[in-house]
């Protein structure tokens, strides 16, 4: 079972952030306190491999788990720490067989209907959203709000990471509604000051962890 603290500040790379490359994004996010990284690139090709290896090594040297989005074979090839799978990807069971018992495996579950028909027995966590409006994912499911997120999180058999429109200002609201972690993309990748946003988000996550230890929630 994954330590939920690892999920607290979850950064997902953005391949469409112009000159702010995924590698620079990851460095900025980790400096701000990111505790886990997911590499997401829907148009991945061999020309991206060099940067992917740089990101893997940067994360490894800082003891930050590094996951690949969707692609189990790529995760195995570059010896990533795990993979995150969507509803239309290969199953978590397949990922576990290929990547091994120590791999971190996550799955996207957007609503109660998907939760009812998704086998999470091989997963360490699941991601749910969008909690708030987001422009990063064009085909995102309907916004569920904190209350809708809580409905899914309360029934989940694994820790849940909130995603979608999350900022330093609303991160605590996600934790208070059952999130073990919050995942962000554009709050850092499309920010006017990415380093400042990463720092502020890190502080919000640290505050959430402190309050959880005190027993306020979680």
Give the positions of each predicted feature:
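A short glycine-leucine-enriched loop at secondary-structure breakpoints
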Residues: 164-165, 178
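Conserved N-terminal beta1-alpha1 strand-loop-helix module at the mouth
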Residues: 1-90, 97-125, 144, 151, ...
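A short acidic, helix-capping loop that chelates divalent metal ions and anchors anionic groups
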Residues: 38, 75, 132-138
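Residue-level marker of regulatory loop/turn positions in helix-turn-helix DNA-binding domains and
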Residues: 141
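Short acidic/polar capping segments at secondary-structure boundaries
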Residues: 132-133, 166-168
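Short, electropositive alpha-helical surface patch
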Residues: 178-187
